[in-house]
Every structure is written in structure tokens, then in C-alpha cells.
Amino acid sequence: MSEAIIAKKAEQVELIAEKMKAAVSIVVVDSRGLTVDQDTVLRRSLRESGVEFKVIKNSILTRAAEKAGLDELKDIFVGPSAVAFSNEDVIAPAKVINDFAKTAEALEIKGGAIEGVVSSKEEIQALAALPNREGMLSMLLSVLQAPVRNVAYAVKAVAESKEGAA
């Protein structure tokens, strides 16, 4: 192999390793068998969720995972591999891919990494079942508002009972 090709591949490894280090969530899939239309829809959905999606050679992924400290990911880089990276939302790649896999049976989740910890296919699917960040924040807000609401109802009930007694 020429030195130019080796240098280019080394640069790719560095770039992917940096993406892996920076990502809060990585999902690796086998997209073999998807139609062009399905692939386009999947990529659009991921892009709208702020997720980067790339098909990368396994040899480059393996070396990048080693450099990123995610050695255990090497076991899932068998067969065609596509990787979804998210730097902001932990749940977004898992949720979009898992929802899409329900309609496109050709898409198979292989595994991934969540905040630097290698995760199995089952863990990625469990993560996908969680609500997104906005959903979790609204749940937290409703839990925090409940005691205040209950106090307000109690004060209102006392005020109404005193009005009725007067």
C-alpha cells in the first residue's frame, strides 16, 4: 500500500476515534438489506435528531475503538457496520434507530457505547424505551409541581369551608 493511502487511513482512524471520545452515545448497526428509500429516511431522521450516521470499514472502526478506549466494541465490528454518533442527546440515536428497526426489519442493532461504557444490543434497546430529554424534564417538573399543587388545593378547600361556615 502506498504511503499516501496509509496516511489517509491513519487520519480516518484519528477522526473516528475523536468522534467516539466526544460522543455521549454510539449505536452500531447492520443496515444490510435496507432499500435506498429506507436508508434515506433513516439518515434524515437521525440528522433531524442531531445524530451523525456513517458507514465505516470494520478495520478502521476497530483501530478507532482501540484509540478511544472502547476495546470491547471490537467484537461487534463483524459484517457491514454503520455507526450513529450523538454528542448531545444520549437517547436520540438509540430511539431513532430502534423505532426505525420496528418498520424496517433489515436494520439490526449490534450494540454501542453510552457515555464511554460499552453497551449490548439489549441495553441500547432498553435505552430507546426511555423518554427523550424533554420528556424526562417534563416528568420531573410534574413531580416537583405536585406537592405545591396539593398545598394549593388544601388552602382552597379550607378557604371554601370557612366561606361556607360564615
From Swiss-Prot:
Keywords: Ribonucleoprotein, Ribosomal protein, RNA-binding, rRNA-binding
InterPro entries linked: Ribosomal_uL10, Ribosomal_uL10-like_sf, Ribosomal_uL10_bac, Ribosomal_uL10_bac_type, Ribosomal_uL10_CS_bac
Pfam families: Ribosomal_L10
GO cellular component, one term: large ribosomal subunit
GO biological process, one term: translation
Gene3D superfamilies linked: 3.30.70.1730
Family matches, as PROSITE patterns: RIBOSOMAL_L10
SUPFAM superfamilies cross-referenced by the UniProt entry: Ribosomal protein L10-like
GO molecular function terms noted in the UniProt entry: large ribosomal subunit rRNA binding; structural constituent of ribosome
Superkingdom of this protein's organism: Bacteria
UniProt-listed PANTHER family: 39S RIBOSOMAL PROTEIN L10, MITOCHONDRIAL
HAMAP family, A to Z: Ribosomal_uL10
Sequence similarity: Belongs to the universal ribosomal protein uL10 family.
Role, per record: Forms part of the ribosomal stalk, playing a central role in the interaction of the ribosome with GTP-bound translation factors.
Complex formation: Part of the ribosomal stalk of the 50S ribosomal subunit. The N-terminus interacts with L11 and the large rRNA to form the base of the stalk. The C-terminus forms an elongated spine to which L12 dimers bind in a sequential fashion forming a multimeric L10(L12)X complex.
Name assigned to this protein: Large ribosomal subunit protein uL10
Source species of the chain: Streptococcus equi subsp. zooepidemicus (strain MGCS10565)
